[in-house]
Amino acid sequence: MVATPDTTADVLTIAGRSFRSRLMTGTGKYRSFEQMRASIAASGCEIVTVAVRRVQTNAPGHEGLAEALDWQKIWMLPNTAGCATAEEAIRVARLGREMAKLLGQEDNNFVKLEVIPDSRYLLPDPIGTLQAAEQLVKEGFAVLPYINADPLLAKRLEEVGCATVMPLGSPIGSGQGIRNEANIRIIVENAKVPVVVDAGIGTASEAAQAMELGADALLINTAIAQAEDPARMAQAMAMATIAGRLAFQAGRIPTRSAAIASSPQTGLVGQSPATV
């Protein structure tokens, strides 16, 4: 039997609120609400992101989404997906805060900030993101900005008061894994707020890799929702997140160019007494 590590003391804290799970999930791209609920339960996550515009407009696949989950047990992370400008993102963030309040989370000021004018690669706009973040912080939001893995932008967003930074591993939904490891390492090294790797993770080994880099948490949606068995993939991602976190805390051995024997090299069969 494999021993299950006790991770209860290792909490993730964002804007003064603590969470036991370091895996966040989404609500999009599932084949049914039943699959979504089963996957969220299997993941053990406590934060679930919701696209405000799609819920507000009852976009296909999002009808009744706000009522499909028990928001007494899950912390809502409204997101500004679909916003191409800072102005749009600010308006949608305000709607998201009201939506959270209507669903019983009166003190929820969280927003996942996405400003994405690029419809092909879905890469975030750094200038628009910074502009929107500055305004939303002034309005009392806990801003979790989705960004390219740009260490200077990450630091600037931290300086204006963002609650986290969320660098992408690779483009949204691409399943390409972690394509910017060096920059994520720099962001982790410099950040004084949680670093959440968001987008591009396709399977559990990539989730573990992101956590081994020192990320504080992950946000994974497509890899779970579009898996052949979403609930099983959600469980795999949860376990990988924990494994990667433990490995980072444990500290990996240094990489070397030559082998180092794990057993003593003295007293080998065939050695003369003089060399033993």
From Swiss-Prot:
Gene3D superfamilies: Aldolase class I. GO terms for biological process: thiamine diphosphate biosynthetic process. The keyword Cytoplasm applies. It holds the Pfam family ThiG. 1-deoxy-D-xylulose 5-phosphate binds at G173, A199, G200, N221, T222. Its EC number is 2.8.1.10. InterPro entries: Aldolase_TIM, Thiazole_synthase_ThiG, ThiG. SUPFAM superfamilies: ThiG-like. Its main location: cytoplasm. GO terms for molecular function: thiazole synthase activity. It is found in: Cytoplasm. The keyword NADP does not apply. The active site is at K112 (schiff-base intermediate with dxp). Keywords: Cytoplasm, Schiff base, Thiamine biosynthesis, Transferase. One of its GO terms (cellular component) is cytoplasm. It comes from the Bacteria. It catalyses: [ThiS sulfur-carrier protein]-C-terminal-Gly-aminoethanethioate + 2-iminoacetate + 1-deoxy-D-xylulose 5-phosphate = [ThiS sulfur-carrier protein]-C-terminal Gly-Gly + 2-[(2R,5Z)-2-carboxy-4-methylthiazol-5(2H)-ylidene]ethyl phosphate + 2 H2O + H(+). PANTHER family: THIAZOLE SYNTHASE. Catalyzes the rearrangement of 1-deoxy-D-xylulose 5-phosphate (DXP) to produce the thiazole phosphate moiety of thiamine. Sulfur is provided by the thiocarboxylate moiety of the carrier protein ThiS. In vitro, sulfur can be provided by H(2)S. This is Thiazole synthase. The gene is thiG.
